[in-house]
């Protein structure tokens, strides 16, 4: 992990394994191809962007495929950037933004200790 601070806050730079990207893409495809899942997972009303498809990823999926990877890397980020140990870790939300021509995300703030 590389740590950079180009404009103030520290930014951790990591490479997400293709296996994890593939899992996320497959999950999004499953949701997109199931109207009831798509309606249940529609996150667009909760977000600030002018984007038609923002899809919430389920807690089950997060726990099964993402939590370990995220925790390991957040732990490294906290240690390298603040020289502190991570005490607690919880993914509050996880969503995928499918952004198309003329859609945009304005400047906005994410609550919580870390976002990305």
Task: Give residue spans per PLM region.
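Catalytic core of non-heme Fe(II) oxygenases with the double-stranded beta-helix
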Residues: 93-116
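A short coil-to-beta-strand element that immediately follows conserved catalytic motifs
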Residues: 83-94
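A generic structural micro-feature
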Residues: 6, 88, 108-112
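Non-heme Fe(II)/2-oxoglutarate
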Residues: 1-83, 104
